[in-house]
């Protein structure tokens, strides 16, 4: 299960279940933790995040997760974005990647840092359908006022967020 069971300067008796790696002249370190990572921003351009099909950006994020693991990061805190499916795929062993602590959709007020609406998007009260592309894929949520932020936070927690990202 890719776990180091014992490190010793003394000889270890190798049995059928033991693999001994000669580490002389090498370094051993624990897995790194990245406390501010975005699977989607690391893997995709902003244009793709705003316009590409969700399946394309999902695949790119999965590839980036594998690369992140190979760079030595065994745990990451995703600071916002649609990673619940990616987390599940990694947890189940479908894809290689680090342990993910997800935030879910970034919560922002109208005109805030995570208001990724295009200039031609109609504000929600006047729009028949309500959700923008980034809201539909779970990248960001526009929440104006305390009640809306509470609802958005609860929705992220319901999906499995371990923390909430407000911008």
Per-range role (PLM):
Residues 8-9, 78, 166:
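Short beta-strand and adjacent tight-turn residues that come in two discontinuous sequence segments
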Residues 94-167:
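Metal-coordinating catalytic core of metallo-dependent amide/deamination hydrolases
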Residues 1-29:
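Histidine-rich, glycine-flanked metal-binding segment
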Residues 5, 74-75, 162:
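Short acidic/polar active-site loop segments enriched in Thr and Asp
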Residues 23-24, 79, 103-105:
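Fold-independent oxyanion-binding glycine-rich loops
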Residues 26-92, 110-118:
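Metal-associated gating/positioning segment near the N- to mid-region
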């Amino acid at each position: 299960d890719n776990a180091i069971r014992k490190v010793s300067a003394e000889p270890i008796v190798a049995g059928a279940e033991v693999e001994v790696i000669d580490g002389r002249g090498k370094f051993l370190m624990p897995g790194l933790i990245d406390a501010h990572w975005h699977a989607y921003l690391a893997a995709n351009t902003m244009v793709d995040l705003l316009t590409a099909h969700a399946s394309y950006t999902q695949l790119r994020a999965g590839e980036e997760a594998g690369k992140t693991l190979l760079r030595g990061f065994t745990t990451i805190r995703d600071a916002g974005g649609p990673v619940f499916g990616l987390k599940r795929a990694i947890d189940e062993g479908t894809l290689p990647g680090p342990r993910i602590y997800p935030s879910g959709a970034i919560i922002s007020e109208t005109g805030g840092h995570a208001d990724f609406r295009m200039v031609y998007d109609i504000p929600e009260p006047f729009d028949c359908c309500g959700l923008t592309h980034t809201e539909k894929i779970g990248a960001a949520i526009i929440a104006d006022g305390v009640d809306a932020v509470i609802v958005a936070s609860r929705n992220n927690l319901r999906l499995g967020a371990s923390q909430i990202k407000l911008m």
